[in-house]
Amino acid sequence: LNIGTNDATFVMLSEEPEKTEQLFEEKYRNFLKLLRQLNGSETKIVCALGSIDYYLYDRICSAVEKYRKETQDLKVYTMKYTKMLSMGLDVGSCFHPSKSRQEKMAEELVKFLKKQVIE
């Protein structure tokens, strides 16, 4: 998963950002439960964030930690992509990651999977 970047803007602009962050974390944890239910107990899930923004990364880590404690499901991991540069080759359309940045992200993910996930 790599979700939460666009949610950061919604959270920051909400009337009560702290409550909205808590709600995001709760909904993220519920989403993990649904993913597990739909994909079975053997599926490994990587909860990533980046490379544009990390505003909700701590909330994602907290959601994963709470989920793991609650369910004893140790096949859920967190990963933080390297932050992209705000100018130059990293930037594509509408300030989203360019093709070359996405290729770098794919390399990061493969390295993470080999080191942390694949047994």
Per-region residue spans from a language model:
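Alpha-helical cap/lid subdomain in secreted, periplasmic
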Residues: 1-119
